Amino acid sequence: MYSSIRLISSRLFLAFLSMLASCPLLLAIDIPKEHIFVFERSTNTNYVCYDINIEGDKLNQSTPLNAYWVIGGGRRTEGLTFFDRKMAFGVKVVSSGENEALVHLTAYKDLTIRICKRDGTWVGIVRWNGHEMILQKMFAQMGGSLGMKCEYVDVYGTDTSTGQAHRERITP
């Protein structure tokens, strides 16, 4: 008897999942395809997404990246707060040109990100410990009593010379 109930429950669950898969409004994540990288933290599932900012067909020189929070597993987005922009996740332009910009995050000035086109796609390229890689994600491991102390940041990307996945760890 219990096995038949489990079988019915499993079938109902699978039917429910297939219904969800056919409903794009329920599963849609509002992240544009032109994002350069994301910044995740260990404290929760919210993350900051960095998108390319194009005006016409040229890179916006004063604001080459748009940064915003993706909250609740992708259910909604919010702009960065003043504190986020000035102290942590904001983008500072070091230099810019028509199709390239050098930027860094306000929290860490030692990692310069070169925004440029590579094979027709906008990417962020970082150089760290002799490796040049196309940036995909940064992950901050938070600690301390309130979870406000950054223990390390892992930088993930694809090595430009080998094409292999690569990770570098930054310890503040």
Locate the predicted segments by residue:
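Mature extracytoplasmic domains of secretory-pathway proteins
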Residues: 62-132
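N-terminal export/targeting and maturation segments
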Residues: 26-84
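N-terminal secretory signal peptides that target proteins for export/translocation
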Residues: 1-10
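Short, exposed beta-strand-loop hairpins at the edges of beta-sheets
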Residues: 143-167
